[in-house]
């Protein structure tokens, strides 16, 4: 079954399951658009949640859909996190930080260090300012049911 057929010049991002639907990112280079599509497996209906101009970001390197709420983000090689949808915001990050998810007014990142011993940290930043609120030892793990565990 192929609910959303591909065309030449398109890139499909990794799908998410959100609100009982499969959410897909489609970067359509010939059309110069980024589309966020929703597929309802029960009704087989496809709807467009957002159509964004390709020019919304300087490149499509590491474009990803994240939660919660549903967001389109780009984590570039310049140590920034760009939220491109549903609003536009940019945050500075540390060198090895990786964005995982948003929960309310908090952004959750993971980072790692080798100084000289290897260790992982969870970095919690303020959504409005990007300032670090907390650093905790450990990693974040998402269970098959969608729960997120902090493991030390």
Residue ranges and their predicted role:
Residues 1-7, 30-56, 72-99, 113-152:
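Surface-exposed loop/turn elements that mediate protein-protein interactions on large endomembrane-trafficking
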Residues 57-68:
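Charge-rich, low-complexity terminal tails
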Residues 19-20, 67-70, 104-106, 146:
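Short coil/turn segments that connect the beta-strands within blades of beta-propeller domains
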Residues 12, 59-61, 96:
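Short small/polar-residue motifs
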Residues 14, 111-114:
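Generic detector of ordered secondary-structure context
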Residues 2-19, 23, 53:
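Blade-loop segments of beta-propeller domains
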